[in-house]
Amino acid sequence: MNAQEQAQFRWNHVAKPLNSLGKLEQLVVQIAGIQQTADVCINKRCALICCGDHGVVAEGVSQSGSEVTALVAQSIVAGTANINLMASVSGTDVYALDFGMVTPVAGTIDCRIAAGTRNMAREPAMTRAQAEQAVQAGIDAVARMKARGYQLIATGEMGIGNTTASTAMACALLRCSPEDITGRGAGLSDAGLQRKKAAIQRALSIHHPDADDALDVLAKVGGFEIAGMVGIFLGGLRHHVPIIIDGVISAVAALTAVRIDPASKSAMLPAHMSHEPAVVRIMSELGMSPIIHADMALGEGTGAVSLLPLLDMALKVYHGPHTFDELGISAYEPQEGKA
């Protein structure tokens, strides 16, 4: 038996009805396949918060200016941001990675490509070479974390304007209209939402990103931190590390990674169904069904780390002593179709 088959065998011998922990069981089996062992262990885990700024902020697509990206990154480094507080519940270490903030922040991991992207409503957000460089930096980040002993990585992001970039990418990759999937991000007004839709439509009309070339989409309307997350998802497959998907920005990065390398999907764990409208379509495209439906849209990886306490509880049962053999009774057998 391979690792996944061994993990399923283990679940079938835990003293409970078959498949009664539902998607949690499926995730544990998936992690066994990623880690290539049925002795699933995710005790050492981290959240990588990818930070970057966006030139499209100049179009009035966000309530805040780019200076807020650096302020939140400072809070992450200091351990006081929302993600730090939520991650502490599950013993998750948090790192901020600078893929391209306008203002560098001491204490972040340096993955910088440039001081923010260009305004995609006027010109391509970045060059293809820059996109490739950021993706590689994300892959390298997974390698570094694996070398430090981390067994699982949650993704997150911080970048004012990045829901605009990620929605533009989703429109291109899914061949749909900004009218259909553009959300309010961090609480835009009606006027702000219209500016956001207009900026996305303008970028798509000017640059014609190629839906069949994910790197082209990423370079023309993406962001450095989004590209970094694409690399993290690709790195998960390469280095046998489970990677948790967060909200809409992370989901777009996951979709982009799958378009680049379809096999990378096997190392991705969906966490929650964000209330951003694009997420439903992306998860459908990926064939994924997130466990948590809490209308979260905070970002920073907060949705991703919310999955960890649930996984920890499932693994307590998976590794626990409460088995049919221990109790001296026969295991349940599938009854579907039996008289």
Give the location of each predicted region.
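N-terminal loops that bind phosphate or other acidic moieties
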Residues: M1-A339
